[in-house]
From Swiss-Prot:
SMART domains in alphabetical order: GAL4 (SM00066)
Protein name, UniProt field: C6 finger domain transcription factor nscR
Native source species: Trichophyton rubrum (strain ATCC MYA-4607 / CBS 118892) (Athlete's foot fungus)
PROSITE patterns found in the cross-reference section: ZN2_CY6_FUNGAL_1, ZN2_CY6_FUNGAL_2
GO terms under biological process: DNA-templated transcription
Region (Disordered): 589-608
Ranges annotated as DNA-binding: 17-43
Key words, A-Z: DNA-binding, Metal-binding, Nucleus, Transcription, Transcription regulation, Zinc
InterPro entries, per the entry: Sec_Metabolite_Reg, Transcription_factor_dom_fun, Zn2-C6_fun-type_DNA-bd_sf, Zn2Cys6_DnaBD
Record's keyword annotation contains Transcription regulation: yes
Gene Ontology molecular-function annotations: DNA binding; DNA-binding transcription factor activity, RNA polymerase II-specific; zinc ion binding
Localization in the cell: Nucleus
GO cellular component assignments: nucleus
Length: 693
C-alpha cells in the first residue's frame, strides 16, 4: 500500500471583512471591499484557513494569534510539555475576562453582548483540557471603557454610510443649524459662538487638535440630538429622507465616537458634554429605562471632574462647568421620576451646589474672557435653562425632601420659585421670536406645576406625614391647574411656533392623573364636559409618547380612564364623546380644545412698563412707565403672592375655568389622589414630577 504523503499546508482564504461580518451583509472579498469603500470606512480584511464544518467542527482547535497562517490543530497525541506557555497565557486571559463579566453582573439587565461574552468564556473553558490547545481569544478593547459591553450601542442596526455623517460637511452643517434652533435654547451647555466657528466655519474647537476624540464625539452627539429634534416634515425638507433614517445613522455614529473617546476615563469636560447630549437624545428617542441607567455614569463622571465645585478660575470655564452640572442635575431629576428610585444627586447635594450661571447671552463673553460679566435683563440665551434649573431645585424640595411636610413651608418654596422665575421674564415679548413664545408659555406651565405640586405632593403618605390642606382663599382649583398644564403642552404641539421644541415637551403623567381623578369626583357636569376632551387628548398623546417607559404608570392611567369613562357614560350619556377625542398635533385640535391666544405683541405696547400691565397683576408699581428696572424687581419680590398671579399671564377665560368649579371636599379629593399614588407604589413605580415632562 502506498504510503500517504504529508498533509499539504492549507492556504489562507480571503473571507468576509470584519465590518461586513458585523453588519451581516454580503462581502465581495476585495481589498478593500465595495461596501466599505462606499461607506467611506477602513476595510479590515480577514485571511485565515477555513474552519472545519460538519462532523469535523467538534475537533477544531483555534489558531495561535502569533501565527495566523499556522495549520488547524487536530486531536492527536502530543508530548506533555507541548503548549504549556500558551495554556498559561490562555488561563490569564480567561481570568481577566471573567473578572470583567462579574463586574457587569450587578446591573439589573444584562445586555446581549454581555451574555455572548459569558457564552464565549464557558465554551472556552470546556476545551482547555488538551495540552496542545492554542486559542485566539475574542478581541477586547480596553479603550472603550466598557461602554460596548454595557450596551451603549443598544439594538440599533447600522446602515450603509453611517460613519460618513460627520465627515459629510453639508449634513453636519445642516444638523448644526438644527441644533442651534431646536436644542441649544433649551439645553444650554455649549458656547454658541465657539460652536458656530467650529462646525459652520471650519475653525478648531477651543484649541483642541484636529480630529481629537473628545471633539469628534461632541460633533456626533450634536448631530444625534439635532436629528431627534426634527419633525418628519423638517427631515424631508432638509435631508429628503425620513427622520428615523437620519436618527439611526446619527445615533450609530455618536455611539461609535463615544466609545473611542472613552467618557468613563476621559479627563475632558467636552467628552462629558457629548455624553450628556447623547443621553438627552436617547431619552427623546427611546422612552425605556436605558437613560435612567446610564445617568449613573454621567453623575459619577461629573463628580470625578469636580463639576459641583467649579474650581476653574477662568470665567468661561466657570460658566461651562455650571451649565453642565445643572443640566446633569436636571436630567437626573427628570429620568429618576419615571422609575422606582430617587435622584442620584441628593437634595442636600443639589441645594449646596446650586450656583446658576449668569443670565447673559453667549455673545457677551469669549473663551478668553477673564473678568466677571453682570446679569442682563430681559430674554437672553440662558433664560429658559435658568428657569429649568430653578424648577428642578424646587421639585426636589417639594417631592424628595422629608422635612418639607406642612403646607406653609411648601407654599413658601413655591413663592420663592415664582419670584426667581418672574424676574427672568421681565420685558419678554412672546411675539418677538419662537424662542420667546415658547419660554413665555412654558414658564406658565412650570408655575402651574409648582403650585399643583404644593397642593398635591407626590410624597407617599405613610400616616406620619400630615396632609397639606390647600388654601381655598387663593381661588385656584386643582383641576384648573392640571388643565392649564395639559393645555400648554397641547399648545406647543399645535402652534407652528412650537414646532422646533415639540421634541422636548411631552405630556406629564402627574397632572394627567390628577385631572382624571378630579373629573371622577367633580360634581359640575358643565365643567367636566369642557375638561374631558382635553383629558382624552392628553391621555392618547401620553400613551403614544411614552409607550414602554413605565408599565405601572400606563396601567394606573388606564384604570383611571376606564373608571371615569364608565361614570361619565352614566352621568353625561350620549351628550359627550367619551371614547373618542382629538389628539395633539391635529388641525382641528386647537379649535376643539379652545386653545388660548398669545398675549398682544410689542407693537401694541407703548412702553416696557405697559408690557407688564398686560399681566393680571394689580400692583401699581409694575405698570408705571419709566421705572428703574431694579425698582421693578424689588417691587416684584416684595409683592405678596395673592397679588402676583403669574398663572394669569393674559390668559383667555377659556384657558382657566377658575370660578366655575364646585370645590369638592378636601378629604374626598385627597382620597382619590392617594389612591393613585398607592397604586403606583404597589406596582413598584417611584415618585414623579409635577411640572417637568
Amino acid at each position: 500500500m502506498e504510503k500517504r504523503g504529508p498533509k499539504r499546508r492549507q492556504q489562507a482564504a480571503h473571507l468576509s471583512c470584519e465590518l461586513c461580518r458585523e453588519r451581516k451583509v454580503k462581502c465581495d472579498k476585495l481589498d478593500p471591499c465595495t461596501n466599505c469603500s462606499s461607506a467611506g470606512v477602513i476595510c479590515v480584511p480577514v485571511r485565515r484557513p477555513r474552519l472545519p464544518r460538519g462532523a469535523h467542527a467538534q475537533r477544531l482547535r483555534r489558531i495561535s494569534p502569533e501565527d495566523p497562517e499556522a495549520p488547524i490543530q487536530i486531536d492527536i497525541a502530543s508530548p506533555p510539555d507541548t503548549g504549556t506557555i500558551a495554556e498559561d497565557d490562555l488561563k490569564e486571559r480567561i481570568r481577566r475576562l471573567e473578572a470583567l463579566v462579574d463586574s457587569m453582573r450587578s446591573s439589573n439587565h444584562i445586555s446581549k453582548q454581555n451574555q455572548e461574552a459569558q457564552d464565549t468564556i464557558e465554551s472556552t473553558l470546556n476545551g482547555i483540557d488538551d495540552d496542545s490547545l492554542l486559542i485566539k481569544g475574542p478581541r477586547v478593547h480596553p479603550s472603550d471603557g466598557g461602554l460596548r459591553i454595557l450596551g451603549l450601542s443598544g439594538s440599533s442596526s447600522p446602515e450603509t454610510g453611517w460613519a460618513s455623517i460627520i465627515e459629510d460637511r453639508d449634513i453636519s452643517m445642516q444638523l448644526c443649524q438644527v441644533y442651534l434652533l431646536n436644542v441649544d435654547p433649551v439645553i444650554k451647555i455649549l458656547h454658541r459662538p465657539s460652536l458656530e466657528k467650529w462646525m459652520l466655519q471650519g475653525q478648531r474647537y477651543l484649541g483642541f487638535p484636529e480630529r481629537h476624540a473628545a471633539v469628534e464625539s461632541l460633533g456626533a452627539a450634536i448631530c444625534y440630538v439635532a436629528a431627534t429634534s426634527l419633525t418628519e416634515t423638517q427631515s424631508w425638507a432638509r435631508f429628503h429622507t425620513t427622520k428615523s433614517s437620519i436618527v439611526a445613522r446619527a445615533r450609530r455614529t455618536c455611539e461609535t465616537t463615544l466609545e473611542k473617546s472613552s467618557p468613563l476615563l476621559s479627563p475632558e469636560v467636552t467628552t462629558l458634554q457629548a455624553f450628556l447630549l447623547y443621553l438627552v437624545a436617547r431619552r427623546s428617542e427611546d422612552p425605556s429605562r436605558a437613560v435612567w441607567t446610564l445617568m449613573a455614569f454621567a453623575v459619577r463622571i461629573a463628580k470625578a471632574l469636580d463639576l459641583p465645585r467649579g474650581t476653574d478660575d477662568n470665567f468661561f470655564g466657570q460658566q461651562m462647568r455650571k451649565r453642565l452640572w445643572l443640566a446633569i442635575c436636571l436630567l437626573d431629576f427628570q429620568t429618576s421620576l419615571s422609575q422606582p428610585s430617587e435622584p442620584l444627586i441628593t437634595v442636600a447635594e443639589a441645594t449646596s451646589s446650586f450656583s446658576p450661571p449668569k443670565h447673559i447671552n453667549d455673545s457677551d463673553f469669549e473663551p478668553t474672557t477673564s473678568h466677571d460679566i453682570p446679569d442682563r435683563e430681559g430674554l437672553t440665551d440662558t433664560t429658559f435653562s435658568l428657569v429649568s434649573y430653578h424648577v428642578q431645585a424646587a421639585g426636589r424640595l417639594l417631592n424628595f425632601e422629608p422635612s418639607v411636610k406642612d403646607n406653609g413651608s411648601r407654599q413658601q418654596h413655591v413663592q420663592h420659585f415664582e419670584q426667581r422665575t418672574l424676574r427672568l421674564l421681565f420685558y419678554c415679548d412672546p411675539e418677538s421670536t419662537p424662542y420667546a413664545w415658547f419660554t413665555w408659555h412654558r414658564i406658565q406651565c412650570f408655575v402651574s406645576g409648582a403650585r399643583l405640586s404644593a397642593i398635591r405632593p407626590l410624597i407617599y403618605q405613610h400616616g406620619d406625614h400630615p396632609i397639606p390642606i390647600p388654601d381655598t382663599n387663593e381661588g385656584t382649583s386643582i383641576l384648573s391647574l392640571a388643565l392649564n398644564i395639559l393645555e400648554k403642552v397641547q399648545l406647543v404641539h399645535t402652534d407652528p411656533r412650537g414646532e422646533g421644541f415639540r421634541w422636548f415637551v411631552t405630556v406629564p403623567w402627574q397632572p394627567l392623573a390628577i385631572a382624571i381623578s378630579e373629573c371622577y369626583i367633580c360634581q359640575d357636569r358643565a365643567l367636566v364636559q369642557r375638561a374631558w376632551p382635553i383629558v382624552e387628548a392628553a391621555f392618547q398623546q401620553h400613551e403614544a409618547d411614552v409607550s414602554g417607559s413605565s408599565k405601572a404608570i400606563s396601567t394606573t392611567l388606564e384604570r383611571l380612564m376606564c373608571r371615569v369613562r364608565g361614570k361619565l357614560l352614566q352621568s353625561l350619556g350620549a351628550s359627550t364623546k367619551i371614547t373618542t377625542s382629538p389628539t395633539f398635533g391635529t388641525t382641528n385640535a386647537a379649535n376643539t380644545l379652545s386653545v388660548p391666544h398669545t398675549p398682544p405683541s410689542r407693537s401694541s405696547i407703548t412702553s416696557s412698563g405697559d408690557l407688564l400691565s398686560n399681566w393680571s397683576w394689580t400692583t401699581a408699581e409694575l405698570s408705571r412707565p419709566g421705572e428703574d428696572p431694579a425698582l421693578l424687581t424689588e417691587a416684584l419680590i416684595s409683592t405678596s403672592p395673592q397679588k402676583i398671579d403669574p398663572l394669569l399671564f393674559s390668559l383667555d377665560s377659556q384657558l382657566l375655568i377658575a370660578g366655575q368649579e364646585q370645590l369638592v371636599e378636601a378629604d374626598q379629593s385627597w382620597a382619590a389622589w392617594e389612591e393613585v399614588i398607592a397604586s403606583l407604589h404597589d406596582d413598584e413605580t417611584g415618585r414623579a414630577d409635577m411640572f417637568l415632562s
